[in-house]
């Protein structure tokens, strides 16, 4: 079954099938940073309805403070994700989330993240459409705009 199905139904994907799905740093709901890839596992984050994406973030990456219009829930799949809430990146506000950790990205609540020495995979689900808006427009990755 296609991963981009827009209706809830039966879905079974192996890791190889997830890796084969659409990817890029310019996907809707992604940070827009070069090197960060987003794979759509289910649904379409640009449209109304349930979606799930997998965010792959390289080691030593900082994602500045940003928001999304929708409420999102996330699970850290691999690596340690350092995540915090606030209008500006603040290393003191980060909480280290190892694999299996769960966190929320409430709609319009500013948050930020960072990876350490290892890459991180995070599975994020929400009810679209979603977007990404940086709190400080100067932190918006070049060419990213609002995604």
Predicted regions and their residues:
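A short, N-terminal "cap"/entry segment at the start of jelly-roll beta-barrel domains
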Residues: 1-49, 138-147
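Extracellular/periplasmic catalytic domains that process cell-envelope and extracellular macromolecules
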Residues: 31-34, 45-47, 67-68, 75, ...
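Divalent metal-coordination and catalytic microenvironments
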Residues: 41, 100, 122
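Short acidic-glycine-tyrosine-enriched beta hairpin
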Residues: 44, 81, 87-108
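Conserved short histidine dyad/triad with adjacent acidic residue
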Residues: 48-68, 96-98, 102, 106-107
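Glycine- and acidic-residue-biased ligand/ion/polar-headgroup-sensing regions
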Residues: 58-61, 67-88
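Short beta-strand His + acidic residue motifs that chelate non-heme Fe in jelly-roll/DSBH
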Residues: 63-65, 83-84, 105, 110-116
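Double-stranded beta-helix
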Residues: 92-95, 112-147
């Amino acid at each position: 079954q296609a991963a981009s199905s827009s209706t809830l139904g039966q879905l079974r994907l192996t890791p190889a099938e997830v890796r084969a799905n659409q990817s890029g740093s310019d996907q809707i709901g992604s940070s827009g940073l070069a090197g960060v890839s987003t794979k759509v596992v289910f649904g379409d984050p640009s449209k109304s309805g349930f979606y799930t994406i997998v965010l792959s973030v390289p080691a030593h990456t900082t994602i500045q403070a940003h928001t999304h219009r929708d409420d999102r829930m996330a699970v850290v799949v691999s690596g340690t994700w350092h995540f915090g809430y606030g209008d500006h990146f603040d290393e003191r506000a980060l909480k280290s989330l190892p694999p299996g950790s769960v966190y929320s990205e409430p709609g319009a609540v500013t948050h930020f993240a960072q990876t350490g020495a290892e890459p991180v995979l995070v599975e994020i689900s929400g009810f679209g459409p979603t977007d990404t808006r940086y709190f400080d427009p100067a932190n918006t990755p070049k060419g990213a705009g609002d995604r």
